[in-house]
């Protein structure tokens, strides 16, 4: 019988991303929040905003998963910022 070790999400990172306005930070947070994580047992992300700053907290099982997940989220944030620039 093989015993499965529980994976702990002990690799963490917090990003603080400033926006020009509180409204932009709130919009970015709301746009990203519904996105499902494919393997929540390996990688988790929480979004919040305080004034004009979007806070993103990442947790993962290892540094590789953290790097890949963070890279993907940053690409999404970049797209959101570009859309805000075009629409404003």
From Swiss-Prot:
Q: Tell whether Ion transport is among the UniProt keywords.
A: no
- Keyword Nucleus belongs to the record: yes
Mind listing the GO biological process terms from this record? cellular response to pheromone; maintenance of translational fidelity; positive regulation of transcription by RNA polymerase II; telomere maintenance; telomere maintenance via recombination; tRNA threonylcarbamoyladenosine metabolic process; tRNA threonylcarbamoyladenosine modification
- Annotated coiled-coil positions are none
Q: Which UniProt keywords apply?
A: Activator, Chromosome, Nucleus, Telomere, Transcription, Transcription regulation, tRNA processing
Q: Which GO terms describe its molecular function?
A: chromatin DNA binding
What Pfam families does the entry give? Pcc1
Task: Give the main localization category.
Answer: nucleus
Subcellular localization, as worded in the UniProt entry: Nucleus; Chromosome, Telomere
> Can you name a GO cellular component term?
chromatin
**Source domain of life:** Eukaryota
Query: Its biological function?
Result: Component of the EKC/KEOPS complex that is required for the formation of a threonylcarbamoyl group on adenosine at position 37 (t(6)A37) in tRNAs that read codons beginning with adenine. The complex is probably involved in the transfer of the threonylcarbamoyl moiety of threonylcarbamoyl-AMP (TC-AMP) to the N6 group of A37. PCC1 functions as a dimerization module for the complex. The EKC/KEOPS complex also promotes both telomere uncapping and telomere elongation. The complex is required for efficient recruitment of transcriptional coactivators.
**UniProt record similarity statement:** Belongs to the CTAG/PCC1 family.
The record describes its quaternary structure and partners as: Component of the EKC/KEOPS complex composed of at least BUD32, CGI121, GON7, KAE1 and PCC1; the whole complex dimerizes.
Q: PANTHER family under this entry?
A: EKC/KEOPS COMPLEX SUBUNIT PCC1 FAMILY MEMBER, EKC_KEOPS COMPLEX SUBUNIT LAGE3
Q: What is this protein called?
A: EKC/KEOPS complex subunit PCC1
**Gene behind this protein:** PCC1
